[in-house]
Amino acid sequence: MHLDLRLERALERVELVTGVGTRDAGRMCVMSLVACLAGEEHTDSPACASPLIRAFAIPLNDNMPHTVRQRLKPFAPRILGTQDGQDTVRAELLRQALSQEILPKLGGGRQAAQARRFSGALWRVWSLLGMRRLEREAEWMMDRAVALADGTDMARAIAAAGSVGRLLARAARETTDPREADRLWDLAVGLLDRMCDVGGVRPSASQAWALRLEQVFESRTARGMPTATVRP
């Protein structure tokens, strides 16, 4: 979805934060931002959004570094309207990504980490234990992937989607290699992008969405409150 300039500028004024945030302060999570655009009450469970996407996106939002989290803002208009009956397709997409992309990548990262030579014995033990925790979690996630394969059990698929999001977030946070963390966050954002693409192009109401955000900041100005800025 192409963002028009007015909506893009309105989104720039929003600060994405952990938790549901405070709409009146211009600080929201990606899902409460979706609710704001849709004209819904302040919530991180907007009725207009795919529950599967929500389950995957929230652990990403809450675990990303602040600057990386801001990359999720353009997804809010794309998530709006994804409550479209296409979550079975999204579940299969996520299942394939888990088995073909995520778990192989984590396995490779684990082996590389174990092969490194660290300077201290305690550091070696800590790193090895951390990677083994990820290995066990990855093996458990492969079992959870069965839930994603069965689109008739969407409650389990939604729970598994949340687990995939948490696994990616944990791997990105625990790696000691900043470049590997960036690659994992890129993988997570790419998966969100692909899930939003399911269902094709949805009708855009960018002017109405921009207006709702502008009203948030106009209200702040009227009360003499500073507008939210994104921290460097």
What is each residue range found by the language model?
Residues 1-18:
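Short, Gly/Pro- and small/polar-rich lid/capping loops
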Residues 39-232:
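Structured binding/interaction patches within domain cores
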Residues 23-36:
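Active-site nucleophilic cysteine motif
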Residues 13-16, 30, 192:
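Generic preference for hydrophobic/aromatic residues in regular secondary structure cores
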